Amino acid sequence: MIDMKAFQELALSFPHTEQVPHHERLGFKVISRRMFTTYLERNNTANIFLTPTEQQLFCEIDKVNIYPVPNKWGEKGATTFELDTIEKAVVTEALLSAYNHVIKPKTKTTK
């Protein structure tokens, strides 16, 4: 089980990250960039922002406790992780993946 304190430590363990309020959730983002995950204390869940392909792979690990967010964000890869039942290593891997997408330099398209 991963509780709020453990999740905060994991999310903030990546370089240049910060915790910010996000509606009723805690948001974790790269400073001066976008969020890579949010945490909801009342049900101990995290929404981790993956690619749709990564989302599919993580959902295959545990279809009951890892699933797409049920809205447009979920179609884009936002994935709910129920932290009471998921191994820390799985959550850490998902957070690292989401973090890497945020820090990755954007490629410029030429016309």
Regions found by a protein language model. Name each.
Residues 1-111:
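Charge-dense, helix-prone N-terminal extensions
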